[in-house]
Each structure stands twice: as structure tokens, then as C-alpha cells.
Amino acid sequence: MIFVVKASCFETNPKTKRLLDLADFVVRGRHRIYVEDEHDVNYATWVETLPQELADDWQLALDYSVEADALEPAKLMVSICENVTSDADAIPPSLTVEDAALLGREPFRIFVENNDADRNFLLTFANLQQKRKLEDLERESLLRFEHCGGIGDVVNKLNSHIAQNPLFFKVCAAVYDSDAKSPNA
């Protein structure tokens, strides 16, 4: 996910902690962050007011974002603005800094009927590299398998999750199987 930080985020009382949280997600290899206008006066002033170590961390996140996107382009861009309310239906989606930080820390969730059985089923079909990656992401709390208890409950749990924040549908998937003895049964 690419977070594009608009100039409005630096105009009045920038949410420095949340912006630095977004930068931390980048450094951990989770997302990318760009500043829409690095020449904006308010942005330059904000960077200058940061302690040197935090300014260096911020720049590292920006540099890492360019490098990571060159190697593997992100598929979702989210615009971060402070003068609007969050709008998950906008193209691109538009979030406040607070909502972006909330979304940024959200693990990718895979909703399954039975946590252990379906998780193991997915890992069985993954090649060795994919399996290691999935296990690493799970260990780092970047991926979570959500037990739903049955096919009927998958939809309910997924809808409940998305109701918390409509943009969460971008960071989840549902996996289920058929227990039918034959196709179309």
C-alpha cells in the first residue's frame, strides 16, 4: 500500500506521531509513503522541527519507499489529507492521518472456516518460498488467519470486520472449500 501524504497534513498542527508511525510501517517493509509536494513550505518547516534522529528516520522511510516500489510496485494507493473526512469510496481512497495509521497497522486477514485445518490446507499447497513467507508474516503479526466456524459465519465475520472501517476490505480475503461429495451437489 502506498500512502501519499498531501500538503494539508502539514498545514496546522501536524499529527507527527501518526506520520512517524506510517514511516515505521515502511521501514518494517509493510507499506510505502510519499509526500505529494516535498517543496511545500509547511512540509519543509515540519521536517526542520523534527529532532535529527526522527528526521533521518522519516527520510529513510521515503528513500526505502522509492526502492521498494521499484522492486515490487504496491497495488493500492491511499491519499492522506487532513482537510477532509475519510472516504473509502474515493479514487484513490482518502484518509485522515489517524485513519491511515489505523489501516497501516492492520494485519492482512484471511477469513477461514476452521483456523487450523484451513490454514494447514493453504500452507500445504504453497511452495517452500511461499510457505516461509506466510509463516514469517504470521509470526510478525502482519498476517492473521481468522476462525469463522463455518461457511455461513465467514460472511458475517467478514462483514463485521469491514463495518469497523470500510477500507479494511482492502486488507482481507476469505478462503473456503466445499464439502460437497461431487461438483454442483
Show which residues each predicted segment covers:
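Acidic, divalent-metal-binding catalytic cores of TOPRIM
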Residues: 1-185
